[in-house]
């Protein structure tokens, strides 16, 4: 199957694209885009991979599914397009970045700048119906993104995994803590942020680790 995804990821994930579940997933997603309003737009489904080459990967942040409001989802977990108001979880992420590193909140919630520094902003589910959270869950995306995490774990070491909330922690459990740096906290959602996300210092701790293995830190 010819999947429109960055060449290095395409080579890495080629076996997945030939499996029956992926054919079923593709058929479902195409039908959904043809008959409903789906986010993100089709060209952005694999944008997290297009923005972050596999060979230079430094950090993995795992989300659940795309934002389902108009103009929000842009293919990177937690990220929104330029000019779009910050969703609450993203506001809380920026507050922790500011408190942790001294970097003031940015003018835009577009996290392209993180992805371009080799942060993979990976949702577990890559598409969603407008105004219907988790509407594409259980259709095969989770199997695909599990394969992504597994491929990273098997082929790379020295990667920082930021696992926020039980869902991300379960998905990231395959990553070997002896070969990587695993950071866990509650989700930055307003429902849980005061139970350990604020004050987790994941951003400075990630940079300390990257420096310790000779890699450039991330400008958060």
Question: Where do the PLM segments sit?
Answer:
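A polyanion-binding, active-site-adjacent surface
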Residues: 3-6, 15-163, 167-170, 175, ...
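C-terminal substrate-binding/active-site "lid" region of AdoMet-derived donor-dependent transferases
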Residues: 197
